Amino acid sequence: MLVKFSKASEVKPSEITSKAFYLDRRRFLMTAAVAGAGAAFGTIAPPVFAAQGNPRVKLSGVQKSKWTQEALGEELTDYGPITKYNNFYEFGTDKTDPSEYSQDFKTKPWSLTIDGAVEKPGVYDLEDFLKPHRLEERVYRMRCVEAWSMVIPWVGIPLSDTIKRVGIKSDAKYVAFETLLDPEQMRGQKRPVLKWPYKEGLRIDEAMNPLTIMAVGLYGEVMPNQNGAPFRLVVPWKYGLKSGKSLVRIELTREQPSTTW
């Protein structure tokens, strides 16, 4: 069976969040708020883990890609809003909960299980697994279903590079992603806000698209805990809820996986 992977230019228009839909939803939510129904607003040689207390740590050897700020033609969102206004329900549902309650989140050591329809399933040390890859900066606009967006300079590697290393079986059709389940560290998981752990999925062609990345940082620095440390998925043509954070498992499947949303 020949598995064909889409090029970045082959993402179907129907799968991209349209600007019109985004703006219409934004207008609707703003109107609702006014009416009283709204709500509050190189190679990886250095560590790829946020240190205790979540200080800012530079990543070395980050290369520019063709997905630059100049190519996008938009201003970058400041570091402050990116790291202080977050959806990461594992730490709480308020926008400031992730930055407040993730400071002591331990991301080292970190293991990643890759299994399912692959040739070399296993449990991998994340830092060792990433070492052969060169980091790239990718500037993408991330849109939230809540009608806000940010332009973020992510640092990471193509997800396809990760999957290719373990070998894709010809009958793999989907890729499932699973976030860490640890209520002692992630206070939000003590409440049944969602069915834990958080799960998401992509079709195999979406996962292998060169735009889809495993991000390990932003603004040239190690990924902050509240943004999904030590690594997260970034799928720029989908809403942010499709990009799982603090991932511990990637499974290639033959059947469409169940997801949180």
Roles of regions detected by a PLM:
Residues 53-261:
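Structured, non-membrane catalytic/scaffold regions adjacent to prosthetic-group chemistry
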